[in-house]
Amino acid sequence: MRSESKKLECIILAAGFSSRLGEEKTLIGVGNRSLIGWVSKRISDRGVEPIVITRPDIIGEVTQSTEECRVLSNPYPERGRTGTIKIGISELDRSDSEGYRLMIVPVDRPGFSNSTLDLMMSSNKSCCPSKNGRGGHPLLLTEADINRVREAPSDAPLSSIVSPTKIEVKDPFLHLNVDTPEDLIELSKFLSFFEGNIEN
């Protein structure tokens, strides 16, 4: 049960570049918010205050978009996603001496449903949602896997460090990846679907 679980923490990854999209993906509009503001609110509405890791050149705009979230900068985002995660873990380690579970949410992979989000947040094992056998996001890590990330090189692919259990879900937009102008069309379709199925 949730009450028996270790405390849940969350890192939102927003340090990637947007060369293929042609505009800053983290800051694209989602209703009256930016994408990072919309994703972070989905997490904070469930009682978890996420840490956002972004790039130095957009940290001011990201901070303004995320209200009361802690926002940190990765000065070397080109070294890869694992290095960004390690920055967040180091920050969490300063205040969470008793250990924690960690949910990792890439800002450009927002197509998970609320039910999938709740499923990940309640898990006591390292896992990720899956559709048609292909893993998606968010990713939930246990203490043991968090420690593996701590000890790994910053440029190591996350897939070489942890092997989460895949949990099959029905989310039609689970594999949405906001990376190109064409993906913005899919993002719009997802938002329409999400607003029409807000409890799902």
Q: Model regions: which residues?
A:
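Conserved N-terminal catalytic core of the sugar/cofactor nucleotidyltransferase
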Residues: 2-3, 37-101
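Residues at secondary-structure transition points
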Residues: 22, 30-34, 57, 75-83, ...
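Conserved alpha/beta core of the MobA/IspD/sugar-nucleotide pyrophosphorylase nucleotidyltransferase superfamily
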Residues: 2-8, 147-200
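Short beta-strand segments
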Residues: 13-15, 105-106, 129-130, 168-170
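Conserved beta-loop-beta/alpha segment of the NTase-like Rossmann-fold superfamily
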Residues: 78-148
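A residue-level structural signature of the nucleotidyltransferase/glycosyltransferase Rossmann-like core
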Residues: 51, 109, 137-140, 166, ...
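N-terminal glycine-rich phosphate-binding loop and ensuing alpha1 helix
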Residues: 4-56
